[in-house]
């Protein structure tokens, strides 16, 4: 009788509920099938059915009729499946029903609620969330919040089952289009990621290691799931044979997979922010660091390549986030950045220079926040991983890791130059020493490889040959001896990476000056000029020791040719100013160099003369300097004592070299020792260059030189570095046999002085019958053959 006076849609709904059967939780099959047909036939009928079913479920819930609630949810699930084309008509009622049922403490009711929610998410493809209205979004957000509370497993009869149900709900959410960030749904990403973190993180190191192993063993096999009921609601067999704890962790990994593969970029970015803030609050322990690294690298691997940069920039912005306690001293966020940069996954679209400048500003702040003297900073930079403040060290390795993946050809060069600019001579000694530590790590990581003939390695080496002369200016511009020593040590390590060159006087004097040795020739002269200036500002004994190593290494690399540049430079560095008497300490290191040359060339007269010179200085020198084998650090101040005159003049040394070793030092090499042979960049003799002539130019591809080549190659040009550039001018050659003037021929004839100063590109090499080219013109070719300056990327403001 109770059905006679009811509307048809109400009758159809009520007939689906079993009558008089206690404990029954399944709806009547035939009435449910007809109800589905009736509701699907018309949208107004569906709206009425959904509204009445919702009121029926709420009524049953408030009267604690759990079985009827379960039946109502199953009816709702069937209607969602059958009426998916009109899902937007019933969406608000469905969500309100689920919101009521999610407040239950009965696990069976909660299970039916989650199943219905998963079905709703799976069949929501026909409707647009934007058409559901504000009421739907508000209720849906409350429902997500309710599922989040459920995933905590608090105040439940079975916490583990409760967590499992909550995670299944978030698995369904992150696999559907309702996962959003608009309006009232902006908290969904934070709920989703925190439900994963609170169920996968543990204070027990053993459990964290267990989760790490699970990620490594299972995450690689995950694939994007199709929009089906099996894909949205976790397959039943996924937990078969596993205990509930392992099943929970597997489901956490699955939700992470959904967030970074199936949600929109904004949802993913908001989730990442919450992930970073969660990890930032953890302690700096090895297990925690491993956990964070594994999770970050795995989600980076899942994330589409074009979106990976968003994860990185979320970490970068969190370096100074107000939501992180003591963000200016936090070490976990820099570690996350390091973990991403050091991973095998490259990040397309990464603006390397912008990132470097951002990291550099934080690096400077970290240096300035630590108060210490120069010697303390030097000692810390000797063992940076152990002694530098943790945050500072992590920021340092983040910068050096920017070159781990090559995003464009000139990336290494840009990073090196940016660091060099960041720590210019106007910055503090501490910042300069930290920058030099970065140089040390950069060149070690790039050059410390067995593939010496590889193209990238050759490119890096060629760049450093051009760049170190500028970076080495700290040898004499810095007022701090610790900065000078650190510069010398890093520069010496670079020299140790180079292989000995075949450059010799025969190469220089009897071949055209346009050779692949021009970069090496320029490098030798630039280095010798720095040595000259450095000798004038020596102040501690450690500088004495490291200079000895540098000049010895230059001889090992370039042989007697280096002597023609280094020895005159050392003699010029004996006097701090032009009219000052020579300093004893500068004389001592010069005497050591002469002894070293004599030993290598087996010229006993040079050895004995050098020792006599050194003995004559013994009364003015610390006894520790007289021990030639000593190479330990000593911060003892050097004496400023001077002598009236130099005991062993340069002319006497040069005469001895040419007389006793004519095969090594031919007579033509005498001019290279003279004052006039100084590098044109640092002498007034450039004013004597001849006027340019109007002659047809030709191009040369010999722009770079390579120190990493086999001895038999005679430094052939690197085809990978081939670049066409107008270097010099010659007369038109009508015959193949006509040759340009050699350096030896140019040296043999005087040149005509001119008051006109020419640029390197205006220098001419002429035939033997034409006017001879002065020595300086030939050496000046080095400058003309320097590589084209590296252009900044278009996104970098100049």
From Swiss-Prot:
Residues modified as Phosphoserine are 210, 726, 729
Q: What Pfam families does the entry give?
A: EFR3
Q: Name one GO biological process term.
A: mitotic actomyosin contractile ring assembly
Q: According to its record, what are the GO cellular component terms?
A: plasma membrane
List, alphabetically, the PANTHER family matched: PROTEIN EFR3 (PTHR47766:SF1)
Question: What family does this chain come from, according to its entry?
Answer: Belongs to the EFR3 family.
Identification of the protein by name: Protein efr3
Q: In which organism is this protein found?
A: Schizosaccharomyces pombe (strain 972 / ATCC 24843) (Fission yeast)
């Amino acid at each position: 009788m109770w059905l006679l006076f009811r509307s048809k849609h109400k009758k159809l709904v009520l007939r689906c509920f079993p009558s008089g059967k206690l404990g029954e939780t399944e709806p009547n099959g035939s009435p449910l099938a007809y109800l589905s047909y009736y509701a699907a036939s018309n949208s107004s009928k569906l709206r009425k059915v959904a509204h009445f079913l919702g009121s029926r479920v709420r009524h049953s819930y408030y009267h604690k009729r759990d079985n009827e609630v379960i039946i109502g949810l199953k009816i709702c699930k069937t209607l969602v499946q059958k009426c998916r084309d009109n899902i937007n008509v019933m969406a608000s009622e469905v969500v309100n029903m689920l919101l009521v049922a999610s407040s239950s403490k009965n696990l069976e009711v909660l299970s039916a609620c989650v199943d219905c929610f998963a079905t709703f998410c799976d069949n929501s493809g026909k409707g647009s969330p934007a058409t559901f209205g504000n009421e739907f979004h508000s209720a849906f957000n409350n429902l997500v919040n309710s599922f989040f509370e459920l995933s905590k497993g608090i105040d439940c009869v079975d916490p583990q089952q409760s967590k499992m149900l909550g995670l299944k709900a978030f698995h369904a959410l992150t696999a559907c289009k309702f996962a959003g960030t608009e309006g009232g749904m902006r908290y969904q990403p934070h709920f989703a990621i925190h439900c994963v973190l609170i169920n996968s993180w543990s204070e027990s190191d053993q459990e964290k290691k267990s989760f790490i192993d699970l990620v490594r063993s299972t995450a690689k096999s995950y694939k994007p799931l199709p929009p089906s009921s099996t894909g949205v609601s976790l397959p039943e067999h996924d937990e078969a044979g596993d205990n509930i704890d392992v099943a929970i962790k597997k489901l956490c990994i699955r939700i992470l997979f959904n967030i970074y593969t199936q949600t929109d970029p904004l949802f993913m970015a908001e989730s990442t922010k919450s992930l970073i803030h969660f990890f930032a609050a953890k302690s700096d322990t090895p297990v925690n660091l491993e956990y964070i690294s594994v999770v970050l690298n795995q989600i980076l691997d899942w994330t589409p390549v074009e979106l990976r940069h968003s994860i990185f920039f979320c970490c970068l912005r969190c370096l100074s986030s107000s939501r992180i306690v003591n963000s200016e001293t936090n070490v976990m966020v820099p570690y996350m950045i390091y973990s991403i940069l050091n991973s095998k996954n490259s990040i397309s679209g990464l603006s390397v220079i912008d990132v470097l400048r951002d990291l550099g500003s934080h690096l400077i702040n970290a240096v300035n926040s630590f108060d210490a003297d120069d010697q303390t900073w030097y000692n810390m930079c000797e063992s940076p991983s152990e002694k530098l403040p943790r945050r500072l060290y992590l920021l340092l390795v983040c910068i050096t890791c920017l070159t781990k993946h090559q995003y464009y050809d000139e990336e290494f060069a840009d990073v090196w130059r940016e660091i060099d600019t960041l720590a210019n001579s106007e910055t503090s000694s501490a910042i300069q020493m930290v920058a030099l530590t970065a140089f040390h790590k950069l060149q070690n990581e790039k050059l410390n490889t067995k593939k010496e003939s590889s193209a990238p390695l050759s490119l890096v080496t060629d760049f450093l040959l051009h760049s170190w002369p500028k970076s080495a200016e700290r040898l004499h511009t810095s007022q701090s001896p610790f900065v000078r020593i650190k510069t010398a040590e890093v520069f010496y390590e670079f020299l140790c990476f180079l292989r000995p060159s075949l450059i010799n006087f025969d190469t220089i004097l009897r071949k055209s000056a346009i050779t692949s040795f021009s970069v090496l020739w320029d490098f030798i002269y630039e280095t010798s000029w720095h040595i000259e200036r450095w000798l004038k500002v020596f102040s501690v004994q450690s500088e004495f020791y490291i200079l000895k190593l540098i000049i010895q290494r230059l001889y090992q690399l370039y042989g007697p040719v280096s002597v023609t540049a280094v020895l005159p430079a050392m003699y010029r560095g004996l006097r701090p100013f032009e009219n000052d008497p020579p300093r004893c300490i500068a004389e001592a290191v010069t005497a050591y160099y002469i002894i070293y040359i004599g030993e290598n060339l087996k010229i006993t007269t040079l050895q004995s003369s050098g020792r006599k010179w050194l003995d004559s200085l013994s009364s003015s020198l610390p006894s520790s300097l007289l021990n030639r084998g000593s190479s330990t650090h000593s911060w003892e101040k050097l004496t400023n004592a001077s002598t009236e005159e130099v005991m062993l003049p340069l002319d006497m040394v040069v005469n001895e070299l040419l007389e006793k070793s004519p095969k090594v030092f031919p007579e033509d090499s005498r001019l290279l020792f003279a004052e006039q042979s100084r590098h044109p960049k640092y002498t007034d003799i450039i004013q004597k260059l001849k006027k340019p002539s109007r002659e047809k130019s030709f191009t040369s591809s010999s722009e770079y030189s390579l120190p990493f080549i086999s001895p038999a190659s005679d430094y052939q040009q690197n085809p990978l570095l081939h670049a066409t550039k107008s270097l010099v001018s010659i007369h038109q050659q009508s015959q193949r046999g006509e040759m340009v003037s050699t350096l030896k021929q140019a040296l043999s004839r005087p040149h005509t002085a001119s008051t006109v100063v020419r640029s390197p590109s205006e220098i001419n090499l002429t035939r033997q019958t034409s006017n001879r080219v002065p020595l300086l013109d030939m050496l000046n070719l080095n400058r003309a053959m320097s590589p084209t300056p590296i252009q900044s990327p278009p996104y970098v403001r100049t």
